[in-house]
Amino acid sequence: MTNQGRNAIDTLLAESLKELTIKQPIEKITIKEITDKAGVIRPTFYNHFQDKYELLEWIIRTELLEPVKPLIQNGMIDQALIIIFAGIEKEKDFYTKAS
């Protein structure tokens, strides 16, 4: 599988988890629910992530941390934090219930 295909599936699984988390606590969400919503089979999930918590970590790293990495490397911590908090605010329902 190409890196682009892998990222597309990762993103699809992430969106599924985010939608499900808004409706119920992450502890109660099953891998089957995530894969059903994403339209993939369970083995596909496990080819990408060990569990839903690794998927959650991927979401945080991809959506909040990686975009600000250049800012942090250049000592622009204040700007990085503003962007991180704006991202959390944008999806506050998800981040509130995912914690």
Please identify what each model-predicted range represents.
Residues 2-4, 22-26, 39-40, 46-57:
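HTH DNA-binding helix-turn interface
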Residues 1-24, 28, 33:
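Basic, helix-initiating cap at the start of DNA-binding domains
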Residues 50-54, 72, 89, 93:
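Residues in soluble alpha-helical coiled-coils and helical-bundle/repeat scaffolds
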Residues 30, 44, 94:
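Residues in the helix-turn-helix
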Residues 32-37, 45, 88:
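Append "Primarily bacterial transcriptional regulators
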Residues 11-19, 23, 37, 54-73, ...:
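Alpha-helical structural segments
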Residues 75-99:
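Helical hydrophobic small-molecule/effector-binding pocket
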